[in-house]
Swiss-Prot record:
Enzyme Commission number(s) from the entry: 1.1.-.-
GO BP field: aerobic respiration; lactate metabolic process
PANTHER family linked to this entry: L-LACTATE DEHYDROGENASE, S -2-HYDROXY-ACID OXIDASE-RELATED
A cellular component annotation (GO) from this entry: plasma membrane
Protein name according to UniProt: L-lactate dehydrogenase
InterPro entries found in the cross-reference section: Aldolase_TIM, Alpha-hydoxy_acid_DH_FMN, FMN-dep_DH, FMN_HAD, FMN_hydac_DH_AS, LldD
Cofactor(s) needed: FMN
The keyword Membrane is assigned to this record: yes
Domain named FMN hydroxy acid dehydrogenase: residues: 1-380
Membrane topology according to the record: Peripheral membrane protein
Entries under CDD domains matching the protein: alpha_hydroxyacid_oxid_FMN (cd02809)
Amino acid sequence: MIISSTTDFREAARRQLPRFLFDYIDGGAYAERTLARNVSDLADISLRQRVLKDVSRVSTRTTLFGVEQTLPVALAPVGLTGMYARRGEVQAARAAAAKGVPFCLSTVSVCDLAEVSRASSAPIWFQLYMLRDRGFMRDLLARAADAGATALVFTVDMPVPGARYRDAHSGMTGPNAAMRRLVQAVFKPGWAWDVGVMGRPHTLGNVAPVLGENTGLEDFMGWLGANFDPSIQWKDLDWIRDQWKGPLILKGVLDPEDAKAAADIGADGIVVSNHGGRQLDGVLSSARALPDIAEAVGDRLTVLADGGVRSGLDVVRMLALGAKGVLLGRAFVYALAARGGPGVSQLLDLIEKEMRVAMALTGVNTLDQIDRSILAKTDR
């Protein structure tokens, strides 16, 4: 099929994947209202089209956390990415490095830190949850440092997992889940061979040293779910700071007061995020939450955002609302599932092209010229 947008990548991924995997990446919590609003609220932001401006020197380059990159984007941490394409984290990391943007590896990745680091020609970021087992966390942070990870993305919006009803219907969870997944895989022979057979081992690579290489994926996920720590408080971040000396980015901030608290404890950055609509349904979309948060913290830390970004135009919208950079989650997984690493490369090229067009038509040449002044008055 012809692919010219993230919507096309999504459709190609739907055709390629068993339902349980497609719905896992595509779905959200409860009735998925916040998931939908992430996309619609951002798409509804109107820009000012300007004319007769010299836009012959458009550049999408920026610097995040002291590292220059070609685009103000990073590939977000997405669990089980290695189930969407053969050794999916490796393929995505290579594509990100080739484009000059960061790849963030999830704690619950199929490929472990060492494998991804060896395969990538550029340093990676690493994402971490607060777990009850502090010894495991300490070991994981040490392994991240040894693997050359340059930034830690610490997820703060998951003291407990969200209620994701679609997973029970699709076979990711629920009655007879394993049998339902097997039947679905039979009808997706391309995926079954490429990932199901050639993509082994299907383990959570970063957790395997604790539970063993032969532990099943469901047991890995069960152990992880039981280890989320709902008692975490702001004071616990002092412990993280003691273990990690590089940039610390808190992911999952949706309230200005929490953003200011992040700045107070010395975080280097935050990600304005509702976990892609996968945690608490009914909260603000990222696009609606972002302006107040950016205003509340000013330049005290670097504000990133995710949620609903499906194009380079959406990236420009997020920058105009106050973000310095954007994380791409579902979009890159759709591309990975559809066409592997080359699909991720194609997506990033598309994002850059769309950004350049949007910048030229709003009359700006550089990212520091993108602010609320390029928004239509109704959206400022």
